[in-house]
Amino acid sequence: METGARIKYHRIKQQLELSDLAADLLLPAELKKIELGEITPSPEVLKALCEKLKIPLNPIENPIGQELIEQFKEMLLHPQERIRIREHYYFILQHPLLNIDEEVELEYSIQLIRFFVITGDLDGAGEKIQELEKFKEFMNQEQYYLFHKYCGNHNYMIKNFDEALNLYLLAEKIAPSSVLPTECGDLYYSIAISAAQLHKNEVADKYSRMALAIYEEEFVPKRIVECHINLGITQQRLKNFKASLDHLKIALKIGKKLNINNLLYISEFNCSIFYYAHRDFNSSIHHMENCLNYIPDEYIADKLAAYCLLVKCCFEKQDYIGLQKWMKTGNNLVIDNNIDLNSPTNQKFSEAYYEFRCLQNLYEENYTAFEKDALKSLIPVLETDKNFHDLAYYYGHLGNVYLKLGKFKKSAIMLSEAQEALKKFNSFH
């Protein structure tokens, strides 16, 4: 970092105005020119400024600090062992070599955005982004690229998918040529999943293939599986059903070879969703039952979502034995974990719990409770998530319930809403 930039960096860091730092030394206008690199300060002025800022006169070479950050960055690129990542974070947290030079300190701050996102501290990530906004001018090209990419990560996690995609595409434009292939792959994959969330299927397909090519070359199995799953989803939306199933089967095959529970979980889950959408309920049940073997006990929302799909399959098959089995299993999960309306802490949890309540009321023919839960709890969540397939499903059930109760006008309205949701689903896919 150049002399003027160093002075400005520490002035901003210490929240000093130009006039505060310049006081008794030189004019604020002269200090501004020094910071901009337009004039070189005399040795006496430079020494006085550095003493006032309490920084060394010259930048410090810090190879050990740089190595600590490189290790941290590598762990964060494809995080698998979050315990090791946390251990490394706590190891370097108070390390004196992270704050003795500006380059390492800035790099560390940027990597903290990624760390907070990975560990689920989204508020911490947001605060770090806000803090770093005023230091963007001091970033080198790679740091500037990573800052925008990690801002994209944060926006993706808070479900601001439009902004996430825009940030990722900007990061692609400003990425330095020295970026490693795996880093490029991670960016392409991030673009793909953001585009998929926005149903920009051609973009999602393009970048999934670009990421897959890199991950196959570099052999990153976890991401190979995830790319095939994303391609399976986008190909289904593009009406290429055979290609969609082929990608999902490849993902499942690789997952079985690697025997990694998380990969098997997402592969089996997406295969089940595919077959459910195509009304092959036996195959859907088979894959979802397999999926349950790989969901950790603490992933309550995921288990509840799996039970919901199994219940819906049994409803469609009119398999009342299976229906009773999965309703009982789901209800035991709710009771054992003391889940109630105040429990959901995020949209995924909310959707799973509200859906299970609706299915339970439907199963027990408690139509008043079903109507209340569907209209007040589940449908608003589905609308927020733009889950048109399930909106059509539950509007349809509401229509049938109103028909049974002789509420013909309400029935017609709900069945019309179901048709509208189905149209939106088909136009999105």
Task: Identify the function of each model-found stretch.
Residues 85, 125, 164, 204, ...:
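Single-residue signature of alpha-solenoid repeat helices
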Residues 14-33:
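Short alpha-helical DNA-recognition segment
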Residues 1-13:
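A short, Lys/Arg-rich alpha-helix, primarily the initiator
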Residues 89-97, 129-137, 169-179, 209-220, ...:
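Amphipathic alpha-helical segments of tetratricopeptide repeats
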Residues 14, 79, 119, 158, ...:
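Structural motif corresponding to the intra-repeat A-B loop/turn of tetratricopeptide repeats
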Residues 100-105, 139-146, 179-186, 219-226, ...:
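Alpha-solenoid helical repeat architecture
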Residues 42-59:
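DNA major-groove recognition helix of helix-turn-helix/homeodomain DNA-binding modules
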